[in-house]
Amino acid sequence: MKQKLLVIGGPTAVGKTDLSIKLAKNLNGEIISADSMQIYKYMDIGSAKVTKDEMNGIKHYLIDAIEPDTPFSVADFKQLGEEALEKIICNGKFPIISGGTGLYINSLTCNMTFTEAEKDESYREYLETLALEKGNEYIHEMLKDVDPISYKEIHANNRKRVIRALEVFKLTNKPFSSYNVGLDFYNSEYDVYYYVLTMNREKLYDRINKRVDLMMEKGLLNECIRLKEMGYNSDIQSMQGIGYKEILYYLEGKITLEKAIDMIKQGSRNYAKRQLTWFRRDKRCIFLDKDIMSDDEILDKVINDIIKN
């Protein structure tokens, strides 16, 4: 019998953290955070990081796990996540994944193979230069002979993906498309229960706007100033996150603070929209509408689904 694994997904500000902690209390569980920003140390307010008080005694993994300037990929998350899952199960606890980064969730629940550990920076730079000089179509055509499947599946303008496909072939002598071919993508060693919280779009957007205002009240500006003083600037991946890059624009004198706040709100709303699009594409997701169901009804449904099966 497969080990059961619970996933709580959904857009930003929908209430995933609160639900996952209540579920962990009821199921004797521990939580893996699948959030691309909460994994970084010192980035607390802008990432709406769960606090020690909010954790309510529930152990969380992959929060404050790496320095802000540490290069971090989905493959890295998969490795850390698998180690966390093993610890949770060995501790006799129920594993719960909670977060809004769909790709991170998939890395632990789908049949995904990564070759991210293998990189050739000089070849990447060569291809980037080639694309700038001769156009995206030129490097896209290079794919035709070595990986015709990726050539058809990856659009010429998705330069990053085209470069990655060419790089994988150069490093492994195997086409990028050969990874996962013939395998059921959703095949997992776990019995996955995947729930996604939703609510009326206008209501969600209002929650997002209010949360950004609360972040400013809690000291997001000072958090960004402190990060900048620690040497973390816009040239690193983590500082390109929503809430950080906009405040950096303000600190660099490029925009007003009011404009930065508006941009954070707009960026967060756009991100929520993309998150929902991602989850709707996943055939495993069971959507729980918070406009129709109360928090207690959602809690009861998830617990009953897991217990009765």
Curated annotation (Swiss-Prot):
The keyword Magnesium applies. NCBIfam families: miaA. It is an enzyme of class 2 (transferase). Residues 35-38 are annotated as: Interaction with substrate tRNA. It comes from the Bacteria. Keywords: ATP-binding, Magnesium, Nucleotide-binding, Transferase, tRNA processing. It comes from Clostridium beijerinckii (strain ATCC 51743 / NCIMB 8052) (Clostridium acetobutylicum). Its EC number is 2.5.1.75. Its cofactor is Mg(2+). This is tRNA dimethylallyltransferase.
